[in-house]
Amino acid sequence: MRALLSRDLRLAIRAGGGFGLGLAFFLIVVTLVPFGVGPQGEILARIASGILWLGALLACLLSLDRIFALDFEDGSLDLLATAPIPMEAVVTIKALAHWITTGLPLVLAAPLFAVLLHLPAPAYLWLEVSLLLGTPALSVLGTFGAALTVGLKRGGLLLPLLALPLYVPTLIFGAELVRRGAEGLAIEVPLAMLAGITAATVALVPFASAAAIRVNLR
């Protein structure tokens, strides 16, 4: 399983959909917002939590189509389906590789980008907590959309339409956690909801993704 994880990390970096692309897209989203809503610090601070979370969500979408596509094209996915490792474990490893190459860099860079949006100082801790809790759910949910579209000629166009509705609860509670942290309000409810969503996603979605892969490989 370690060998599979290291292989997926190398493939993700070599394919060009890893660290740099997601961060660049995140930065573009954050820098374009002031042009659209104006440079007023008060307005930017009010919407910063939503913009940062939306940027992270869209950045995660960029490389979802590569989670299974490369393995499907070279036949590795068929070999993995017949390997002694359960397909659910393969899905989990691929989600982890996607998070390490996409989600983790966003978590580390988010405080720097938050400065551009005048995010209040008390919210920085909760921004990091929310992204650490929520971005793994984005990667795991993305495996389900990628599994449904693997092998389709225009799967990359269909994938965002499938993944975005699944991302909405994570987006809502992640942004709400940051907003409440910025305003000094109680954060227990959005924190618990975000943690619950991620826990349920990690526990259940790999089984659905594995089932979708098995159907597409028949």
Curated annotation (Swiss-Prot):
It holds the Pfam family CcmB. It is a multi-pass membrane protein. The chain crosses the membrane at residues 18-38, 43-63, 99-119, 131-151, 155-175, 185-205. GO terms for molecular function: heme transmembrane transporter activity. The keyword Methyltransferase does not apply. Keywords: Cell inner membrane, Cell membrane, Cytochrome c-type biogenesis, Membrane, Transmembrane, Transmembrane helix, Transport. One of its GO terms (cellular component) is plasma membrane. One of its GO terms (biological process) is cytochrome complex assembly. It is found in: Cell inner membrane. Belongs to the CcmB/CycW/HelB family. PANTHER family: CYTOCHROME C BIOGENESIS B-RELATED, HEME EXPORTER PROTEIN B. Required for the export of heme to the periplasm for the biogenesis of c-type cytochromes. This is Heme exporter protein B. It comes from Rhodobacter capsulatus (strain ATCC BAA-309 / NBRC 16581 / SB1003). The gene is helB.
